[in-house]
């Protein structure tokens, strides 16, 4: 099975094996490159959460415990300690789907405080190293 089919079929076993081979620290590093675990809008919304992308060091600092393989495996399917926001997942998925172009969402409020649609997003840069 390849990545495309594993995603299409939501094949957990494929992602368990990838996670096991890569390890949680490489998963964490890659997830952060896609914008997971980071605020999207910055100070625009005071209530926005960053989420959490765990690593061995995070667990040691936060819980005083060592990381175990089972945690790596479930991290591979987005379970365990991972916390993300819907907009983070949307932007990550868009970057995968469009071949590596990272975009930031834009919120436009008109004079009447109504959210207006945006005609076109401008890509910031191409990050196709993460897309194979």
What are these regions (language model features)?
Residues 1-132:
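Beta-lactam-recognizing serine transpeptidase/beta-lactamase-like catalytic domain environment
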